[in-house]
């Protein structure tokens, strides 16, 4: 879509422009820029983790180049919650302008502060809470409690002269939240009474009918599984899911076990959660990892990171026998208390297989209710639309199928189809005279963090890395100058392809036959010989191993 649109014209006087630099037509790297009267307000600034087709990339950022020449116009960065796909890129934005005010709840600011400390940044923080407001230049922001899978989530209503925009962030309507803080649907409905001109709504689970299960349903399942375990229990979950960790701790303590946190982010986040009063556990019930290893197996529960098969996460290292403190044994119970993020299937199943090989019992959400989503299902989104009654809707936080499903829900509640705007990253949506419409698009791409380098990593570079990930085969042939006939056997070397030294012997014979055929056809040009050798080796490797390694032929004339 964005490639087909012209750049947006100057914003109409008094209008409001909304441009997502990430998070629309994808799930991750959420960042939305609001423009009014020449000033900017940013909501969220997150990262996307690379897929298998982006080797060597550490993180993917929103395209910050769009605002690099307008940094002085930014009034504030409002953060809806502290998940990585909403805060992970904040240090990279602050390196461009360190004094941008960062606005968020107590828990959100605590995690952002730790992240910025790792980058040696000391931002200006503005702490807010639900039922409060803050003024940032021409933008007045009003905050509403939101239930999700991390403490301190907020929806934000942005009041401007052009109208009111309500951004849900990540949202769920859990009616039995463990922290006693349900999504403030009454408050949002009162906002709807006053008039919501544009509603940016979470689309993640818009395809799921009905209502999402409550987080409170997970606790009894965890209690039952831990009670039935005869040995050690290891529960893997997201390091930010404080309510989940609280339920694990409650079950463990009730069953006479003590707990230990494993993984840097888990230790850090739970330390912050305890300090701020979100996680309640006695000191006597917590062990460090060394003490936990000395405990009888049936008296300890380890709470660890690694739910997505991340190679360096604690659970993955345990599965490979590489964790410096924990050695898994047959009889351990491993509970994966998380969802499977699309794209991570191979890594997660690989970890599960490794755990099963050791003899551990692995329980996932497929076998028992050990996880529930933090995003609203379709039935909950209908409640939101009927409560807010927006004039215009812009689905966010989802791929195209999620956005379209969310748009259909909005239409079913009476929002006119012409007032539902389906956009993607880079597309500008202008709110003028109470009507939202697409005005154009700016060019946005992906900003890659690749080691110490931040910027573009082109398709050609990623393509080369993908080829290298399949291995490397070097072929050296010596031919007589003038005739092209082989002067000796072909010499092949492989790296990252096969450990069998004889694996390439059949193709060496094929290369020699190809050289004889070329000489018979009077082909003597070294470049043409090299091309033929590459084709011969590539075809054989593809047919034999279903691999496409990098193939480098060298032709030496004598």
Curated annotation (Swiss-Prot):
| Stretches that traverse the bilayer | none
Instruction: Name the SUPFAM superfamilies on file.
Output: Metallo-hydrolase/oxidoreductase
The UniProt entry lists the main location of this chain as cytoplasm
| EC nos | 3.1.-.-
SMART domains in the record, alphabetically?
A: Lactamase_B
What cofactors are annotated for this protein?
Zn(2+)
Its domain of life?
A: Bacteria
Q: Where does the UniProt annotation locate this protein? A: Cytoplasm
Q: How is the cofactor bound?
A: Binds up to 2 Zn(2+) ions per subunit. It is not clear if Zn(2+) or Mg(2+) is physiologically important.
Name the positions where Zn(2+) 1 binds: 81, 83, 148, 170
Q: Could you say which residues bind substrate here?
A: 371-375
Q: Which UniProt keywords apply?
A: Cytoplasm, Endonuclease, Exonuclease, Hydrolase, Metal-binding, Nuclease, RNA-binding, rRNA processing, Zinc
Q: Which GO terms describe its molecular function?
A: 5'-3' RNA exonuclease activity; RNA binding; RNA endonuclease activity; zinc ion binding
For the ligand (Zn(2+) 2), the binding residues are 85-86, 170, 397
Gene Ontology terms describing biological process: rRNA processing
Task: Explain the consequences of disrupting this gene.
Answer: Non-essential, it can be deleted. No effect on processing of furA-katG operon mRNA or of pre-5S rRNA processing. Complete loss of mature 23S rRNA. Minor effects on pre-16S rRNA processing. A double rnj-rne depletion mutant indicates this enzyme plays a role in degradation of previously processed pre-16S rRNAs and a decrease in mature 5S rRNA.
Per the record's keyword annotation, is Hydrolase included, yes or no? yes
Instruction: Please name the InterPro entries in this protein's record.
Output: Metallo-B-lactamas, RibonucZ/Hydroxyglut_hydro, RMMBL, RNase_J, RNase_J_2, RNase_J_b_CASP, RNase_J_bac, RNase_J_C
One cellular component (GO) term of this entry:
cytoplasm
* Record's subunit section: Homodimer.
* Function of the protein: An RNase that has endonuclease and 5'-3' exonuclease activity. The 5'-exonuclease activity acts on 5'-monophosphate but not 5'-triphosphate ends. Endonuclease activity can cleave within 4 nucleotides of the 5'-end of a triphosphorylated RNA. Plays the major role in pre-23S rRNA maturation, and a minor role in processing of pre-5S and pre-16S rRNA.
Q: Which protein family is it in? A: Belongs to the metallo-beta-lactamase superfamily. RNA-metabolizing metallo-beta-lactamase-like family. Bacterial RNase J subfamily.
Q: What is this protein called?
A: Ribonuclease J
